[in-house]
Amino acid sequence: MWMKFIKIRKDERLSVCLFLLWQLIMHATVIIPYYSVFSRISKDYRKNFLDWFHVSGFDPLTYCVVTDWTTAYDVHRHPLLAFFYYPVYLINQGLMSLLGINCVQFLVAIVLLISSLYAFLLMMRIGKDLLHLSQRESSVLAFLLFSFAYVLLAAISPDHFILSLFLILLVIYVTGKQMAEHKPLKKWQTIVFFILTAGVSLNNGLKVLLADLFSKGKRFFHPKNLILVVILPAAAIWSFGLWEYKTFVADSVNTRKAHEKKAVKDEKTKMWNEFSDTTHLKDSKQQTEVFALLWKKHRKAQLKAKYSAPQYAHSGTPVSKQPFLNWTDVTTSRYETLVENLFGESIQLHQRYTLCDVIRDRPVFVSYNWVVNYIVEGLIVLLFLGGIWAGRRSKLMWMCLSFFALDMILHIGLGFGINEVYIMTAHWAYVIPLCIGCLIKSMKGGIRNAITLLTALIAFYLIVYNSALVIFTL
């Protein structure tokens, strides 16, 4: 079964060759500018990668993990990701000993390229095997998905998003095949998919549970299924994340907090010594009261400077400052987010602040210089909405829309990561070509060919437009 999945079919080869050629060019675009710095053997790899790598808001933490293994990711959100990369780290250690250079860029690029290739193949096969489109139509949908700006960037950036896209599409494909045969997902399939998907990015594990719900219907709520497929795997992942935090992270966090507390205490002592040496006040109580006011004013100025930095200034007000809820945002404009970021930057890069990071040097909202960008955005949204209507009787489409709805609740509703919502594009963008596929499937003759041609032209435009901006910016 797996060999059949891995093997590239004869009618897929041309599309795959074109896709690989394009991806190799884009990987070279990311590797070349940083090679002279990242290939050197150094003592502080983490600082080196974080200081130099700058592709939008993507983090080069995978470079850190593969070079000098640590649980560099947020262990609650990505509990297994560092462990998945451990074999790659061992290979890199061997190559570093043999060659005397850090091969991290090439090794990570191989992982990303394989993930991208099979995500591309899965999108094609969803079109052909599940929607029953032609090979040509399915290829157009797959190229459309990867033409989206932040799917393209996810495919070439050392972050987790392209791995998540591959796993989500694998879940959709396997679940779709099972539903087409009127069979539910097997328990072991759901458990394995959940562990892998949630292990890479915790919230995507919920999509596996939604897939299980769609494949089983009411049987999903059977106590045995809830215990074996939902409760035990979720408890295992969460417990592993807690163990991972205590084992690998807690000590460094406590040390950092202690250093910060000591630094503030030392600064206060230094200020007090300077104040007491220069003040004309003689009364010790009066000195203490005046210094307390000076220190309060000083700390207020420090905090004001800290929170005026883009990392904080570009974040809205959270629902609460409690853990997890402090990632939410209730004040950032939803309308501008939808127009300029969710269906804007996610799909078409802006001409200004290209590949800039909202935490460093990019405003939350940027407008396009050309009206054609808004026209293309409008066409894609119309095709998407038309596809939802055309596929309204498709169980597969509603399952994928439930995945999309989950992301929209998190990002648009609760505001999780809303100030850079486009970074998460790979988690949900597949729903657009899938819905357009439903629209194509519902049509016949000239109208079907016209919609396919329009989709192909949009994909070609986005490939050229986004690729050119990336190449000339880097």
Predicted regions and their residues:
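Transmembrane-helix signature of polytopic, membrane-embedded enzymes
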Residues: 123-147, 398
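Membrane-interface alpha helices of multi-pass inner-membrane proteins
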Residues: 185-204, 208-216, 229-235, 457
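Transmembrane-helix motifs of polytopic, lipid-linked glycan transferases
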Residues: 110-131, 383-386
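Lumenal/periplasmic acceptor-binding loop at the mouth of the active site in multi-pass
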Residues: 60-106, 289-384, 397-400
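Short acidic/glycine- and proline-prone juxtamembrane loop motifs at membrane-interface regions
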Residues: 156-161
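Transmembrane signal-anchor helices characteristic of membrane glycosylation enzymes that use polyprenol
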Residues: 7-58, 64-69, 232-248, 458-465
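Specific aromatic-rich, kink-prone transmembrane helix
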Residues: 163-180, 435
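Transmembrane alpha-helix segments characteristic
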Residues: 139-142, 394-411
